Regions:
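Secretory targeting and sorting signals
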Residues: 2-24
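N-terminal low-complexity, Pro/Thr-rich disordered segments
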Residues: 20-26, 203-206
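Conserved SGNH/GDSL esterase-like catalytic core that processes O-acyl groups on lipids
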Residues: 27-113, 140-142
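Sec-exported extracytoplasmic/periplasmic mature domains
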Residues: 38, 42, 46, 50, ...
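Conserved beta-strand segments of alpha/beta enzyme cores
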Residues: 56-58, 128, 157-159
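Residues at the C-termini of beta-strands that transition into short coil/loop
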Residues: 61-63, 133-135, 164
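Active-site segments of SGNH/GDSL-like serine hydrolases
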Residues: 98-104, 115-147
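Catalytic His-Asp segment of secreted/periplasmic serine-dependent ester chemistry enzymes
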Residues: 136-206
Length: 206
């Protein structure tokens, strides 16, 4: 079993207790802020159903989104950055934030952006953040993944969901190797669930 799959299996087991506890008090509130890569979840009913089991998920997945810097423009629309989106939700952000952003920028400034989003999310009442790694179809994405993994050492409330490792070799993508097919969107939704429950249970000890 590859390391990515092994870690995922451990997370599934570890998240069961948190899911059982949350079921007694209603769906767990979650906000998912992303760019166009995870956006397929927004229009694939099976993917939404997979992600939302036991969760009250707000999907904010926008084409051309960047982390902190001004987003690019697509078909005349410029979405708010991930930071602006997070800040805009205030105390309604939810218990868990999922971030899957970085394909429209380099790793320059990404470290500072992670820290700003972490501070905002925690100040707004989130227990923590699930941060999704990028598919390394370009060398610049490797640099961003290095930054994401290093951030987990600074922030015990940040849990890295290594989508790059887990999705390696899978036929879930379009021609660019990034954007998801319907099967890929459902796979990403299923992949994220145990990470969400793990974060909801509280930060891991050092």
């Amino acid at each position: 079993m590859r390391l990515g799959a092994a870690v995922f299996a451990v997370l599934v087991v570890a998240s069961l207790a948190a899911a059982t506890t949350a079921d007694a008090s209603g769906p767990l509130p979650v906000t998912f802020v992303g760019d166009s890569v995870p956006a397929s979840i927004s229009y694939i009913p099976a993917a939404q159903a997979q992600l939302r089991r036991g969760l009250k998920v707000r999907l904010d997945l926008r084409v051309c989104r960047r982390l902190v810097q001004p987003s690019c423009t697509y078909q005349g629309e410029t979405p708010p950055s991930a930071l602006q989106a997070v800040q805009g939700y205030g105390r309604s952000l939810g218990r868990v934030l999922i971030v899957n952003v970085g394909y429209n920028e380099s790793s320059a400034g990404y470290r500072q952006g992670v820290d700003r989003i972490m501070r905002a999310a925690l100040a707004q009442g989130a227990a923590g953040v699930v941060w999704v790694t990028l598919r390394e179809t370009r060398s610049i994405y490797h640099g961003t993944n290095v930054v994401i993994k290093a951030a987990a050492k600074r922030w015990p409330q940040l849990l890295v969901a290594d989508w790059n490792a887990f999705s390696s070799g899978k036929p879930w993508f379009g021609d660019d190797g990034l954007h998801l097919t319907a099967t890929g969107a459902t796979a990403l939704a299923a992949f994220l669930r145990p990470y969400v429950w793990k974060v909801a249970a509280g930060p891991r000890p050092h």
